[in-house]
């Protein structure tokens, strides 16, 4: 197991090094020289992925405009994902809702279902964590009512409802004394997320998974269980980085999640052998 962890650490180092071999300036220079539509979209996506703070939104919006012009659904999705992250994480609700509407209009099939469900889920999760009273109650009751008739829900709706309820239980545990039944219920909600996500292509399920694994590692009742979740956590991140679309995006891997997966695996090493 120690040898395995050493190999994993080397792999993590390779991710870090790869992100340092290219700079935003070199990508901007390459963008100025690019002549084909496809090259511009690929470079803009990498520029967006490697950017920080306000530059992410600037580059994502440029990518979105060029993806619209090229009518390229994948790059529309990539751009909208980062635009929506920026607006939702800074509670710019009107702007977020505007771009959710654009996603519903521009994207097709599972790309639309996945992205729209994920972003609405994050909006509702922020309501759970940062509000109280009627807004919070409305979100919770909506999820509970939906889950009473699961056959009417899409996999994405089931995932979103279970994730939101899991986060609500987690928030209550942090605010109050931890009750054994609450602890069990929170874990069950997150396990339900995994059960539904396994039915979907990783390309579309991925957004829902890293934080779910992070929470399940925290909920684990013993080091062996934590190690099992951490192994799946890490394999999911690495598997996603290896799908065809992501092989062209070496800077898109979330290093915070990758480090979290490695850390949970490392502290469970003795238990999982």
Regions found by a protein language model. Give the residues of each.
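Positively charged n-region of N-terminal signal peptides that target proteins for export
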Residues: 1-4
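Sec-dependent N-terminal signal peptides
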Residues: 6-9
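N-terminal signal peptide c-region/cleavage motif recognized by signal peptidases
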Residues: 13-14
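A "functional boundary" signal
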Residues: 20-273
């Amino acid at each position: 197991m120690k040898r395995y962890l050493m190999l994993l650490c080397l792999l993590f180092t390779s991710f870090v090094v790869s992100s340092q071999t290219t700079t935003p300036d070199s990508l901007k220079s390459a963008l100025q020289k690019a002549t084909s539509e496809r090259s511009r979209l690929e470079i803009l996506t990498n520029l967006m992925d490697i950017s920080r703070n306000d530059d992410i939104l600037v580059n994502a919006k440029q990518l979105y405009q060029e993806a619209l012009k090229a009518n390229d659904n994948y790059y529309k999705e990539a751009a909208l994902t980062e635009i929506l992250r920026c607006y939702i994480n800074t509670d710019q609700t009107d702007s977020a809702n505007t771009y959710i509407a654009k996603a519903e209009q521009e994207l097709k099939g599972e790309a639309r279902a996945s992205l729209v469900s994920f972003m609405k889920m994050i909006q509702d999760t922020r309501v759970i964590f940062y509000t109280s009273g009627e807004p919070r109650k409305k979100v919770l009751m909506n999820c509970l009512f939906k889950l009473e008739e699961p056959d009417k829900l899409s996999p994405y709706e089931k995932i979103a409802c279970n994730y939101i309820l899991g986060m609500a239980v987690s928030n209550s545990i942090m605010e109050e004394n931890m009750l054994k039944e609450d602890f069990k219920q929170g874990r069950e909600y997150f396990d339900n997320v995994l059960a539904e996500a396994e039915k979907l292509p990783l390309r579309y399920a991925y957004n829902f998974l890293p934080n779910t694994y992070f929470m399940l590692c925290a909920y684990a009742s013993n080091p062996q269980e934590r190690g099992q979740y951490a192994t799946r956590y890490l394999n999911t991140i690495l598997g996603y980085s290896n799908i065809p679309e992501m092989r062209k995006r070496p800077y898109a891997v979330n290093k915070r999640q990758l480090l979290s997966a490695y850390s949970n695996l490392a502290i469970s090493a003795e238990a999982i052998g």
